[in-house]
A protein has these predicted regions:
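Recognizes extended acidic, P/S/T-rich segments that occur
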Residues: 53-83, 95-99
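Pro/Thr/Ser/Gly-rich low-complexity, intrinsically disordered linker/stalk tracts
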Residues: 20-48, 82, 97-115
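Sec-dependent signal peptide cleavage junction
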Residues: 10-24
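Glycine-rich catalytic cores of cysteine/serine-nucleophile enzymes that process amide/ester linkages
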Residues: 133-147, 173-178, 246-303
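N-terminal capping segments
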Residues: 115-200, 319, 323-356
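...with weaker cross-activation on analogous glycine-rich loops/strands in unrelated enzymes
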Residues: 202-280
Length: 356
């Protein structure tokens, strides 16, 4: 009887060991972007996975349907209905004696704009995807010649190396020790250029192309492309979702403004890609925007927040930056069917994070 119990115990232990070895992780960094009549879905690779299954649920449908089985880490679905919302989820699988499935990654949503390339919400959804998992790297997103986008600046989805590098850093992280460590993270203009590339394109691009440029030139250049309007720092009256704000030393994206005049923004600034808040219109620190940024960083990025809890920025973010604002509507590059440009930062953050 003792021998039988011992054998059963060993079988159970061995069985658990085999299952542990066979267990697959869930895909991280899942991102979906509607680009005209196409949807590109990307994710970070899962260790030991042989492939991935992608499921879709279109607006008005009750259940998810499998739409693709692939060995790659990104796919493009073509000829999608315009002006429609789509949800996606991805899981990894491994084929041994039988097929083993991992858990689904985070469910994501995008929209194919009816008459535009993309939407303001798609832009902000893309911009917050690397938050909390991507460090600030001086030169990150640029080419070695420092003349334009490098591989990361024209990369569809998240580079898994960003998360790997981020996970090894401590609260004492000093970006000066990692200058031009290409592939490890993004600097301010590399981040903005990467965000725009991902709402405009569906395939990785060639270094030297894309939308990475000096921070000081971004707002004026995007206006010259015909995407929207430009205002110098002295002419700015308000801040709206999706605004790109340029100065001689930095560039950031507006998430939304608050009733006290403070602004929630997303940017790559030491230590990395994160949400931050400005003072209110009277210059008082610790206003609504900072409270919102802290609350969302603490809730959704706890590991990052424990290491880098600072979320406040100075008054210069409201006074010293030129502004680019997307023109929306029929025939524009970005449309705003979600009316983000008319919503407060609180409403936008709730929609981006809480309504999943």
């Amino acid at each position: 009887a003792v021998i039988i119990i011992f054998l059963i115990t060993m079988l159970l232990v061995c069985g658990e060991t085999v299952m542990a070895k066979e267990r697959l992780g869930k895909p991280l960094g899942v991102l979906a972007n509607g680009v005209e009549d196409r949807v590109v879905i990307s994710w970070e690779p899962v260790k030991k996975a042989d492939g991935y299954e992608v499921f879709e649920k279109a607006e008005g449908e009750k259940a998810f349907t499998k739409v693709k089985v692939t060995k790659k880490r990104k796919i493009v679905l073509k000829k999608k209905a315009r002006g429609r919302r789509y949800q996606y989820k991805v899981r990894a699988y491994r084929t041994k004696k039988k097929v083993i499935y991992g858990k689904f990654g985070k469910k994501v949503e995008t929209m194919t704009a009816k008459d535009s390339t993309s939407t303001i919400k798609n832009f902000l959804t893309t911009a917050i995807t690397p938050v909390g998992s991507t460090m600030y790297i001086w030169g990150g997103g640029w080419n070695k010649e420092d003349t334009g986008a490098g591989k990361d600046g024209v990369f569809i989805g998240l580079n898994p190396n960003w998360r790997n590098f981020c996970g090894k850093q401590k609260a004492s992280y000093n970006y000066r020790r990692h200058r031009y460590q290409f592939g490890a993270g993004l600097d301010c203009s590399g981040f903005v250029g990467w965000s725009i590339y991902n709402i405009m394109k569906t395939k990785d691009g060639k270094p030297g192309h894309g939308y990475v440029m000096k921070a000081s030139k971004m707002a004026s250049s995007f206006a010259k492309y015909g995407w929207g309007t430009y205002k110098s720092a002295t002419g700015i009256k308000d801040f709206k979702a999706g605004d790109v704000m340029s100065s001689s030393t930095h560039v950031y994206i507006v998430v939304g403004s608050c009733q006290d005049g403070s602004v929630v923004l997303v940017h790559s600034s030491p230590a990395g890609v994160r949400l931050s808040g400005t003072p209110n219109r009277q210059g008082k620190a610790g206003g609504e925007a900072v409270r919102l940024a802290k609350a969302y960083m603490k809730k959704y990025y706890p590991s990052w927040y424990r290491r880098y809890p600072s979320c406040g920025k100075g008054m210069s973010y409201l006074t010293d930056y030129a502004q680019f604002r997307w023109t929306t509507g029929k025939g524009s590059v970005l449309d705003d069917p979600d009316l983000y440009q008319n919503k407060t930062a609180k409403e936008i953050l709730q929609d981006l994070y809480d309504k999943k």
